[in-house]
């Protein structure tokens, strides 16, 4: 059994790409922590430290940035986010 990964979804309200990223993770049954950057602006600093930027959405798995919705979607098409999650194991 694959160990559970810590998945963060940095998002903003009224962000269509954020909604798509959330929906993809939910569809795949992947547990994630949703961080609303507008409700917790201090987390913007955390996002910038992890990814080098402040754009939303951003997906981070076990402290490693995956990217935004486009990158998440590409990973899903290439074998599923589940595969990407398990690839994070080192």
Where are these regions (language model features)?
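Local sequence-structure signature of Cys/Sec-based thiol-disulfide redox active-site neighborhoods
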Residues: 1-33
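Thioredoxin-like thiol-disulfide oxidoreductase module
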Residues: 36-54, 83-87
């Amino acid at each position: 059994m694959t160990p559970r990964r810590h998945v963060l979804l940095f998002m903003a309200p009224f962000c269509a790409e954020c909604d798509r990223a959330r929906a993809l993770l939910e569809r795949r049954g992947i547990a994630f922590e949703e961080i609303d950057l507008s409700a917790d602006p201090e987390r913007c600093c955390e996002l910038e430290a992890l990814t080098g930027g402040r754009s939303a959405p951003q997906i981070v798995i076990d402290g490693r940035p995956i990217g935004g919705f486009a990158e998440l979607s590409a990973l899903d098409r290439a074998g599923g986010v589940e595969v990407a999650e398990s690839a994070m194991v080192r």
